[in-house]
A protein has these predicted regions:
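Short linear motifs at protein or domain termini
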Residues: 1-110, 235
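Generic hydrophobic alpha-helical segments
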Residues: 17, 138, 201-202, 206
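Conserved amphipathic alpha-helical segments that form helical-bundle/coiled-coil interaction surfaces
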Residues: 104-184, 195-199, 213-227
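Short helix-capping and inter-helix turn/linker motifs at the boundaries of alpha-helical repeat units
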Residues: 8, 192-193
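C-terminal effector-binding regulatory domain of bacterial HTH transcription factors
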Residues: 2-3, 211-241
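An N-terminal domain-start capping segment
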Residues: 64, 76-82, 145-150, 210-213
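Short amphipathic alpha-helical interaction/hinge segments
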Residues: 80-83, 182, 186, 226-233, ...
């Protein structure tokens, strides 16, 4: 491991441990070196190592067993949305991150598809007005960041329009991960224009209370995103290999 300069040391220590997990140097169920050993190896204080370990515990990478030590957790099955985001941002070149990305998008397709159908049946006038306003914000956006924000809020409003509050909660729990992907996807005005057209079709189906067309429209949106993001991450994996 490298020794760190005194800049965001706590974060850097946590990321170094993450990288050892991603690379397979530390495997699920394996015990970490003691805090004293890690501190000596990294050239930092034990208190900073302890804080970094607590951070990694909170998002599901590590677990501490009293009088036994700290171990790599079964993060695939016991992790959190924050852990998933960390995998995507820092571990996108490994197979686990790709697998998790695919699983996340499959889950989102199921969720958005069901919500689109329910929203076509249950959306109120105020729901449709909000969706229309957010679509107008997407049309008017000049910068990718503005567009990404309006896009995220549109899909969050779609969840609420379904009438199922748990769907909206599930979507919100993945906010950080979804925002990350949305920001990576909308990097050009051409993609923004295509997305506006696709969302116009979705809103039209909702206004017409056509569940079948709403389902079709949202699946087109999701599959387009999956294709483009897979291309992006494929390029990154090639560059890092």
């Amino acid at each position: 491991m490298q020794k760190f300069e005194p800049k965001s040391i706590r974060t850097q220590v946590a990321m170094e441990i993450e990288n050892r997990i991603f690379s397979g140097d530390l495997k699920v169920g394996e015990r970490l070196p003691s805090e004293r050993e890690l501190a000596h190896e990294l050239g930092v204080s034990r208190s900073l190592v302890n804080l970094a370990i607590l951070d990694l515990e909170s998002i599901g990478f590590l677990k501490t067993i009293p009088r036994q030590g700290t171990f790599v957790a079964d993060y695939k099955n016991e992790g959190t949305p924050q852990m998933l985001l960390s995998l995507m941002v820092n571990g996108v070149s490994n197979n686990t991150a790709v697998e998790l990305f695919t699983s996340l998008m499959e889950t989102r397709i199921l969720l958005e598809n069901e919500c689109a159908k329910r929203a076509a049946e249950n959306a109120t006038d105020s729901d449709l007005e909000l969706l229309s306003n957010l679509l107008e914000q997407m049309r008017a956006a000049k910068e990718p960041a503005q567009f990404s924000e309006a896009n995220f809020r549109f899909h969050r409003a779609l969840m609420s329009a379904s009438g199922n509050i748990v769907y909206a909660m599930i979507f919100q729990s993945f906010e950080l991960v979804i925002r990350y992907y949305v920001s990576k996807y909308f990097t050009s005005t051409s993609r923004m224009r295509v997305s506006v057209s696709q969302h116009e079709n979705l809103l039209k189906a909702l206004v017409e209370h056509d569940a079948s067309k709403a389902s079709e429209a949202v699946q087109i949106i999701m599959h387009e995103g999956i294709t483009r993001l897979n291309e992006l991450f494929g390029k990154k994996r090639t560059q890092r290999s």
